[in-house]
């Protein structure tokens, strides 16, 4: 039986007390000091009457204190709810007002306080941290350990709920059970760049990987200025969104900085075109890893330089399922499809979500007999590599014909001059809906060439109504493309217009 989460982390910190856990500018926090912070938060939470099953919302910056608060609440068996930056006044009640007993925050604003309602407000400071109490792991396996809310870009944020059982079996939180591939990845996390938000499930699991492997989480003093932050802080591992990777590849500064310390650059969050992955492998070599996963499922597949060297078609894939992941491709009726056939990707692991918090309808649609539908479309080849082709629900119906935005995006990205491609559907009086494409290009690209690529790959009917060149793609707080904002930039572009620069 594995140690109940987060026992392995607490034991790991205690085993090497002098090793640095966090580095933030001139401040270095040792593992012993981090454990002391955890004990002080534990004391404060216990005095507030909190224990197993209680909801604790945590709203902090990326700091050692923020992580210590999360560990303390988890050790007590609480349901830890991350409050990410950027939530609107309308979204906050969906996050903080859902059965939360306490709010832990360093500087809560009026909107957050209003959303918290009757919950106890515990401000991080001398009073809360006055009396330490040794953390004793009290989590009950069947209880919810963590609720991570989605961006809410398509409506109210959905809370991805993981049990203590799932966290106990999680791929990154149990070093005694790490697979060979996880151990190899962790070896590169000596100095892990920690930025963005501690509410990100992805950032959390890789922070765990860093600390459990004896590494140091390095927090930049300001938003990271890629690529120079990698050289300045001697970073060995970093997560990247696709737009950040594009910046690294396209910035003249990348050739000017010393990146010899870098061992892992893991890109995930949205599709990466094969020719851009090829550029990244050429530039960064074995440090480059492309990952695929969901907040609901965790890390599912990885594509490495070693994979591409052994099987060149793998460049068009997102890698093979990790050893602890079961994966099937199914048709619309739920039947398993043979190798090479495209369908919806279903996965099963020991650490998938229990469901969406207080949302039984969405949960029932997502989980069937322990299997989770990703709502992504793809196929597996004979060597087990997964190829993504679109989103099961990201459809645009033009003249009663269904088109997948992801498929059009991937077709546009085949053009060597296209660095990014995003497709959005919008109502159209003539065709019901119309597909509108937005591309970031390097050199000048002719509209006719882009239309020809889509027509060749998918047929004339899939060619977007408009193609707009943009300098950069707006992103959501999660780092994913903000397609709503892209559509707003289109303004009054008519379906017959040619490529427009914005």
Stretches found by the model and what they are:
Residues 2, 18-49, 55-63, 71, ...:
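Conserved AMP-binding/adenylate-forming core of the ANL superfamily
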Residues 18, 131-149, 155-156, 182-192:
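Conserved pre-ATP/AMP-binding loop-to-beta segment of ANL
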Residues 30-32, 145-172:
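Conserved AMP-binding A3 loop
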Residues 35-43, 160-184, 195, 213, ...:
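Conserved structural elements of the adenylate-forming
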Residues 103, 349, 354-355, 365, ...:
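AMP-binding/adenylate-forming catalytic core of the ANL superfamily
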Residues 171-191, 199-237, 251:
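Conserved AMP-binding/adenylation subdomain of ANL enzymes
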Residues 236-239, 251-312, 326:
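Gly/Ser/Thr-rich phosphate-binding loop
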Residues 459-480:
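AMP-binding/adenylate-forming catalytic domain of the ANL superfamily
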